[in-house]
Amino acid sequence: NLQNLMNDAEKKDIDEFVQFDRTSVRDRDMAAAAKLIELLNDDKPELILINKVGAHFPVHDKYPDAFMAYRPTLPRGQFTEVADTGERNGFNGQVDDWVLYRNAYKNTVLWNVGEFFARVLAKGNLNNALLIYTSDHGQDLHERGNPGLNTHCGGDPVEEEGLVPLVVIQGRDLKTFDWSAQLAANKDRSSHYNIFPTLLQLMGYDLAGIESVYGKPLTVPTGDEFTFNYRFNARLGAKPEWKHIDLGSIVTPTQAPASVAAGQ
């Protein structure tokens, strides 16, 4: 199966297509990190796209025991080789269940995000590289105490489901754009729709031509309405429905001790 509706004809346009089917689900992001480090260190101009495992449910077994910093957590061993979906047997969606889920989720983030970047930043030559990192959707971790089984993609999503990280990391020797110039204006005012125009501008395409067809890159004021589409129109042909994100109503977790946040 190919991600994001990619077909075989499009796959043929990729010079090197890598999958880690024989690697344990838990270790696939680390395999991706190792491959990214290899490519960063080969001193060749390349466009690299990585679909990470990340912290998609089920999150019971997506981290090693050494990264079980948050406890108590979901029972281990049932989903060791399940990448992106799973049965909910034994999970009733009540307050106590979500306490366990949030701890397992945070442990997974420590491993598949924290350790991933720790390795890339330590071993990869980023001096002439530019990395854009994001996630495909946010999560309803039921921090309001609301019962339920879904973390995302329901018919009536909470606003947290539309919140994702959007990070640009540029190497010290690479001269592209002044990313800080629009940071204040664009922080919490940008979306996935700004990523593709940004890539085109990095490739040298004319800004006016990009904006007229694809919209604004992150190098200019994006003016994004800060909404997210919660209908799967791209996949199912439905008309998109947009929900505004009010940052004043977002629930955020409490600050963890530094030792816990570092996975120690």
Each language-model region and where it sits:
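Short Pro/Gly-enriched coil loops immediately N-terminal to beta-strands
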Residues: 157-163
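Active-site-proximal alpha/beta segments of enzymes that process anionic O-linked groups
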Residues: 1-92, 163, 191-192, 197-205, ...
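Feature marks short, surface-exposed loop/turn motifs that line or immediately flank catalytic pockets
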Residues: 54-57, 137-141
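Soluble non-cytosolic domains of exported or imported proteins
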Residues: 23-30, 99, 103-110, 186-193
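Membrane-interface soluble catalytic domains
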Residues: 38, 118-128, 139-141, 145, ...
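Short beta-strand segments
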Residues: 47-54, 106-109, 130-135, 168
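A long, amphipathic alpha-helix that forms part
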Residues: 34-37, 75-131
